[in-house]
Amino acid sequence: MLERLHEQGFADLDAAHLTVFQYPGPQGARPSDLAVQLRISRQALNYLLGQLERLGYLERRADTDDRRSKRIALTHRGELVVRVIREAVAELETTWSRQLGPKRFAELRTLLLELNQHA
């Protein structure tokens, strides 16, 4: 994934940054909620968000419901990263489905989601 992003012009991203772009992505999330979802500390997430903000992938904006809080907003550049990631995942899923067959691939996907919930 990282290699593909670098090829597409996002050479300033590293593997740690990809954590933030995991499905469903950071758009509109509160940093504290995203940290829980990603199972990382708020401090670690804020460090990554700061880097991604400086690199122009996202902004932290005041929450319209609670001015004391912030929400994450992807910039155009951040939205492009999400698009590249989704395209790469779709291609990988198509390849795996072709190799395993649709039924076995569906089973694999179900098992992986189950494992992720218990991680």
Where are these regions (language model features)?
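N-terminal helix-turn-helix DNA-binding core of bacterial DNA-binding proteins
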Residues: 1-41
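Short helix-coil-helix linker/hinge
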Residues: 10-16, 75, 100-102
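The N-cap/first-turn positions of alpha helices
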Residues: 14-18, 78, 93
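Short, conserved alpha-helical segments within structured domains
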Residues: 16-20, 70, 104
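Conserved SAM-binding loop
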Residues: 23, 74, 81
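Canonical helix-turn-helix DNA-binding module
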Residues: 27-72, 79
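Terminal interaction helix/tail motif
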Residues: 80-119
